[in-house]
């Protein structure tokens, strides 16, 4: 994340707003590394709060246990030994829920156990008055955690495009797509524009995104990943277009070469 910089993700934001009134309790968001999941959840936290919806932002790698209810009681300084409906949570409704955003649940030391606990928690608090937006980093759908089909009613599915062989999470998850062309152009302007004075890292190459596209299309095509975009503009701050090496140039390779040379 770059402080003060967020590239709008219209489709994903619409999906995360439109499910607010759903009866389902789990919105499973997934994508590859560097796709902008954390930035998106931080933006949705802002949007939910702006709409008057109580929201809590948690990071998977900072849980003190693999029990969501215990974590909520600890973070909110609630009385231990009581159920949530005894602590005022019953006041939330399907239309005006408590929204819990959990970023990077896969980074928890016992991620599968945490995921199962979240499902059990939502099964216990059915009705849509408590909702969880859960992000999980994977490279392919085969790496997603498996949920029993008995949880189908609590897992939100915007579309039912999955094939019959897909399990519940595979067919229900929202896959955060790479940046589209307009978003890439906008992100380039955001990343290379006026920077926060507290941010000491330069991100202004001596060429435009359009010039890069004409120079090396395969290189510019990799910038649909927000993390690769950031690494690229930092590596080429104050520099001209990268020299052609013939063939495909990987931004990850360039980045690793830079680290080795330091």
Tell me the role of every PLM-derived stretch.
Residues 1-26, 112, 121:
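Walker A/P-loop-proximal flanking segment of P-loop NTPase domains
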Residues 30-98, 110:
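Post-nucleotide-binding-loop coupling segment downstream of the phosphate-binding loop, primarily
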Residues 44-46, 141-144, 149-151, 165-168, ...:
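Extended hydrophobic
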Residues 1, 68-78, 87-100, 157-178, ...:
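Extended charged low-complexity segments that act as oligomerization/scaffolding linkers
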Residues 100-135, 146-149:
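Conserved Walker B catalytic segment
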Residues 62-64, 106, 137-142, 180-184:
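Conserved nucleotide-binding/hydrolysis micro-motifs of P-loop NTPases
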Residues 71-75, 115-119, 144-156, 238, ...:
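Short secondary-structure boundary/capping segments
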Residues 22-23, 94-96, 126-129:
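Short loop/turn elements that form and flank the Walker-type P-loop nucleotide-binding site
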């Amino acid at each position: 994340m770059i402080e003060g910089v967020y590239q709008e993700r219209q489709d994903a934001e619409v999906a995360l707003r439109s499910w607010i009134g759903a009866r389902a309790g789990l919105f499973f968001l997934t994508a590859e590394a560097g796709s902008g999941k954390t930035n998106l959840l931080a933006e949705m936290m802002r949007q939910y709060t702006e709409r008057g919806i109580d929201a809590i932002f948690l990071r998977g790698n900072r849980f003190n246990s693999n029990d969501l209810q215990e974590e909520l009681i600890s973070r909110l300084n609630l009385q231990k030994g009581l159920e949530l409906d005894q602590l005022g949570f019953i006041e939330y409704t399907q239309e005006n829920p408590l929204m819990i955003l959990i970023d990077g649940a896969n980074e928890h030391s016992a991620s599968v156990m945490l995921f199962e606990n979240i499902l059990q928690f939502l099964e216990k608090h059915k009705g849509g008055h408590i909702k969880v937006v859960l992000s999980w980093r994977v490279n392919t759908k085969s790496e997603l955690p498996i949920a029993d089909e008995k949880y189908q009613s609590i897992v939100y599915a915007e579309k039912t495009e999955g094939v019959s062989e897909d399990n519940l999470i595979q067919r229900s998850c929202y896959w955060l797509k790479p940046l589209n062309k307009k978003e890439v152009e906008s992100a380039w302007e955001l990343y290379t524009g006026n920077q926060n004075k507290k941010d000491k890292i330069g991100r202004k190459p001596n060429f435009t995104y359009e010039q890069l596209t004409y120079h090396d299309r395969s290189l510019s095509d990799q910038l649909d990943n927000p993390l690769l975009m950031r690494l690229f503009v930092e590596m080429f701050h104050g520099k001209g277009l990268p020299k052609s090496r013939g063939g495909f140039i990987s931004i990850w390779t360039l980045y690793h070469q830079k680290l080795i040379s330091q």
